[in-house]
Amino acid sequence: MRCPFCGNVDTQVKDSRPAEDHVSIRRRRFCPACGGRFTTYERVQLRDLVVIKTNGKREDFDRDKLERSIRISMQKRPVDPERIDQMISGIVRRLESMGETDIPSKKIGEIVMEALARIDTVAYVRFASVYKNFQAADDFEDFVHELRPPAPPES
């Protein structure tokens, strides 16, 4: 692992343990060249995924991009950050275990929306507004109306 301080490629692992999410390994490293100490996280990647964008363009799957978009939709929501991390790891595992290396961005969006709907409806609507490209307040209203269960008949 390259030292982020001096660029030396010969660093030493001083401590290694499971991370809080129990999906990755946290390693404390030391650089003998500059004395710098830093932490790295390592996680299993089952396969290299490629995202097929709606315009047909292909790009490597970026877990960080997925995480950023989910965290933006979750801003200022009363959801435990560890729960968000678990959700993201679950989404990535689901994508990796689909058996396909090429995954349409639409499929990723559907999986994310499914997960968000179970955790926080406000984050779900926020994500949907970007994913479904809402253009006006009516788009929000229609979407939220679909979420509401039908009113019971009055007697």
Swiss-Prot record:
Q: Report disulfide bridges, numbered on this chain.
A: none
Indicate the segments forming the ATP-cone domain, all copies: 49-139
Which domain of life does this protein belong to? Answer: Bacteria
UniProt-recorded Gene Ontology molecular function terms: ATP binding; DNA binding; zinc ion binding
Quote the record's cofactor note.
Binds 1 zinc ion.
Name the UniProt key words of this record, in alphabetical order: ATP-binding, DNA-binding, Metal-binding, Nucleotide-binding, Repressor, Transcription, Transcription regulation, Zinc, Zinc-finger
Give the UniProt record's GO annotations in the biological process aspect.
negative regulation of DNA-templated transcription
Q: Per the entry, which co-factors are needed?
A: Zn(2+)
Q: InterPro entries attached here?
A: ATP-cone_dom, NrdR-like_N, RNR_NrdR-like
| Chain positions of all zinc fingers (unnamed) | 3-34
Q: Which Pfam families match?
A: ATP-cone (PF03477), Zn_ribbon_NrdR (PF22811)
> What is the annotated role of this protein in its UniProt record?
Negatively regulates transcription of bacterial ribonucleotide reductase nrd genes and operons by binding to NrdR-boxes.
Q: State the similarity comment.
A: Belongs to the NrdR family.
Q: What PANTHER family does the database record attribute to this sequence?
A: TRANSCRIPTIONAL REPRESSOR NRDR
HAMAP family noted in UniProt? NrdR
Q: What is this protein called?
A: Transcriptional repressor NrdR
Q: Which organism is it from?
A: Ruegeria sp. (strain TM1040) (Silicibacter sp.)
